[in-house]
């Protein structure tokens, strides 16, 4: 199972790609595998504020609906609108095509609370 080393991870199975003061957030390959076939994705609007630990959207699979939890706080710069028409990208390409949101960080220290790829791999038993 892929756990890219350049990303950071949350206990709720979100990944975070850091690029300066902007982060890209998505869900991990492990999470999409647990959910099964994704049929719907709900994401926040551009300029919405998200807060660490709060829900910022949801993914619906044939099995269940799962909330998305913000691993960091900040302002949404971009939402991946392609996922509205192609939610299957979450299953097919969780780290590339299926990024969820791009966020301007409001508190960079929150990144220190996220896990490394090695720590995340241990958590999921890989």
Curated annotation (Swiss-Prot):
GO terms, biological process: glycine decarboxylation via glycine cleavage system
A Pfam match: GCV_H
Sequence positions bearing N6-lipoyllysine: 63
Cofactor note: Binds 1 lipoyl cofactor covalently.
UniProt KW keywords: Lipoyl
Claim: tRNA processing is one of the keywords in the record: no
Superkingdom: Bacteria
Entry GO CC: cytosol; glycine cleavage complex
Alphabetized SUPFAM superfamilies for the sequence: Single hybrid motif
InterPro entries per the UniProt record, alphabetical: 2-oxoA_DH_lipoyl-BS (IPR003016), Biotin_lipoyl (IPR000089), GCV_H (IPR002930), GCV_H/Fam206 (IPR033753), GCV_H_sub (IPR017453), Single_hybrid_motif (IPR011053)
Domain Lipoyl-binding: start-end pairs: 22-104
Cofactor: (R)-lipoate
Stated role: The glycine cleavage system catalyzes the degradation of glycine. The H protein shuttles the methylamine group of glycine from the P protein to the T protein.
Family (UniProt): Belongs to the GcvH family.
Oligomer status and interactors: The glycine cleavage system is composed of four proteins: P, T, L and H.
Name of protein: Glycine cleavage system H protein
Source organism per UniProt: Staphylococcus saprophyticus subsp. saprophyticus (strain ATCC 15305 / DSM 20229 / NCIMB 8711 / NCTC 7292 / S-41)
